[in-house]
Swiss-Prot record:
Gene: pyrG
Species of the source: Gloeobacter violaceus (strain ATCC 29082 / PCC 7421)
Pfam families attached to this UniProt entry: CTP_synth_N, GATase
GO cellular component, one term: cytosol
Residues that hold CTP according to the record: S13, D148, I149, E150, K188, T189, K190, P191, T192, Q193, K224
The protein's name: CTP synthase
Pathway(s) the chain acts in: Pyrimidine metabolism; CTP biosynthesis via de novo pathway; CTP from UDP: step 2/2
Residues the entry annotates as binding L-glutamine: G354, L382, G383, M384, Q385, E404, R461
Domain Glutamine amidotransferase type-1: 292-533
Any GO molecular function: metal ion binding
Binding positions for ATP per the UniProt entry: S14, I15, G16, K17, G18, I19, D71
Residues given in the record as Mg(2+) binding sites: D71, E141
Record CDD domains: CTPS_N, GATase1_CTP_Synthase
Amino acid sequence: MTKYVFVTGGVVSSIGKGIVAASLGRLLKSRGYSVTILKLDPYINVDPGTMSPFQHGEVFVTNDGAETDLDLGHYERFTDTDVSKLNNVTTGSIYQSVINKERRGDYMGGTVQVIPHITNEIKERIRRVAHDTNPDVVIVEVGGTVGDIESLPFLEAIRQFRKDVGRENVLYIHVTYILHIPTAGEMKTKPTQHSVKELRSIGIQPDILVCRSDRPLSVGIKDKISEFCDVPVRAVITCQDAQTIYAVPLNLEREGLAHQAITLLGLEQRQPDLRDWEILVDRICNPSRAVTIAIVGKYVRLSDAYISVVEALRHAAVALDAEVKVEWVSAEAVEERGAGYFLNNVDGAVVPGGFGSRGIDGKVSAIEFSRGHRLPFLGLCLGMQCSVIEWARHTAGLAANSTEFDPQTPNPVISLLPEQADVVDLGGTMRLGLWPCRLQEGTLAHRLYGETLVYERHRHRYEFNNAYRKAIIEAGFQISGASPDERLVEIIELADHPYFIATQFHPEFKSRPNKPHPLFFGLVRAALERKETERLPASPAPVPLPSAV
């Protein structure tokens, strides 16, 4: 029988429910249990694909082409398991499904209501994940904060779920925050008490409390929380702020989170194997050197908009016994002050993906600087498209652009994918998900990957215009990767540059702490070589971690 763990949050938003859920997944997998993690998002959007990065952060793309919440990236990175469209459910998708059923007449003329129709649909989505993946444990993160009106249908659904599948098969974990008042020198539990009271008023009594704090909880504080929240002291878990998110599983293991969860679910207690994860965290926290890499983007005011890029850089750095210091550079600021002002003192640069014309000239300027000053460079999606525009303007002397930014440009070096010509809706209609890419032997990309056929995740509507293919090759660029039918250019690179490579896909989505992505490894390695002269490994040396169950 599959077991279910529901993770809710209280007191404040962005409290770290996703990291707690992902950490528990890691701890269970270290004991040999198979796990999948599901995110329930209370917003009415069908998916986050059309949401502003400033409001939502990164849109994480899965192998099957789902545009999902960034927490799914944490799930994949912590558990080393691919997730799918089934692992992200929104209020919008629930209502869309229920309304479609009503229009088809599935409810036989009945009045459609939140209870039972919406709650039943939510429960069905949870069961579907369990049915399709057949894990030992399904961990469900409930988005939002207890007390939010948007979350009520989800909370009612998970309340009912325990009755449906049996109390012994369901566990409720509530993540809360313990405030410290510096002037009083005290830690305050009252917000946590009120949060649990709110949860209990819905009919959910948490089994475990995970208490975020900037310092350890004293025995007295744990006793107080236990007394007022009706949770055993052993189930009051400290989750202290950590130097790196990858240390959280180890901290929660020391606090006994997994032991308590396994006991309450009636599973067999097994000895965890976290030795390799401990090595990983030690290398993250104690690097022998550092390198600075600029991320030149449109959404740098919210670093979560590029969270997978940052994590991919960190994964590569760990494999090289280094730390990456990220320099955030606004593409619009580059337009005002010039690329040199921001890039003169960095060791490498990344131009990530995005949409729209704002800041494009700044990205192009940053790419021109990187090319001309031999600065290690990696372009991602829009970053590749801007690399082509930069070449066309400054090497070929063309008044070039993308038709996304200028539909009337005389030299459309980037143009709309043919299959996108008649697309009207924006949501879920791009080229999405995992697609094959064939690499040219002898190229930098081929050396880094070490294989000829690779699969990468995509999210784009525009592509390199093949009418300019011959010209870009004559100008010195190599097309080192393309779709197997040779129609879509996937990777371009410069052979006479220390490291200049750009991709139409998003390699950051496939990077893992123990398996850095080859292209990010290559960038960080080139940046280190620029900074120092010592010999470095020639290929990514994965940090060993327990294999996926």
